């Protein structure tokens, strides 16, 4: 069956269970909109180990053991106590965790909305069905180029079969993200078109320098980026990423970042960090992270915000664009080296 024919069938299959899930999400978002103390999304690292070694990634290693199931369940319980809406399981490669399905079940059982990031290599028909049965709401698959190169191994050629399996069997939402700059611009456009042909949301994120700011694009890359932005299915995504066009045009975006409050990252050691690109900022045990921490982070401007290209940061802050940030910025610097994260615990 061709990709186009598969896409004509798959959306009907995916919609069957999505309406109820979408309604649950909308109820959670509505509750969070009136309660600024509630986190919208937490990125929960389940393992640092990854089966790939992409040149731009500093969030993995090849040796770390998975976070124990009991520890993950305790962290999920704490996120539920805080009223978190989304929990995104990430790594490393989450599919390397032997108890991933049970982790997803626990997220769902606690009334939270489970999502996950993956490079897709370990997906099988059986795993996709198991993820669906466990209650997974959304999956983001990284796909950067047509064929593997020195920068990224997340490529359409080896993953095309995995995409077709997702189109045929996934009842959860699927979004495919391309890091713009991991391959020639024409390849990014070809990937986006191939993904859209299968009925998935095709998104493109800007590559970042070590400080977290976006790398500049030349005229050719800007033109291709605009073509990807104009793909019809970009308008169907749950969260818009239109801030990227403004960032490319003006070099900055004026917004109020709610890192550490509306969204944050929980590392393998159970510490809360403002966000993944700024690991080390605000590192504090999740078990001790409470309303005062959320409120302080909510009210604190972030000096890196104007040039931030991180989509979930902007998305997680949109509910509160009108709410003030009266505190001065007083963030400690991040401490990290490629491939490993060095943490300073704040109590």
Where are these regions (language model features)?
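Secreted/processed peptides and extracellular or luminal domains of membrane proteins
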Residues: 56, 60-63, 263, 281, ...
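Flexible mid-to-C-terminal extensions adjoining Fe-S/redox cofactors in radical SAM and related proteins
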Residues: 269-347
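Short cysteine clusters
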Residues: 50, 54-57, 257, 275, ...
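Short, intrinsically disordered, charge-biased short linear motifs at domain edges
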Residues: 40-45, 240-246, 286-299
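Flexible, active-site-proximal loop/turn residues at the rims of small-molecule/cofactor binding pockets
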Residues: 63, 93, 145, 208, ...
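Conserved alpha-helical substructure of the radical SAM core
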Residues: 2-138, 329-330, 335-340, 347
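Processing junctions and N-termini across compartments
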Residues: 44, 48-51, 251, 298, ...
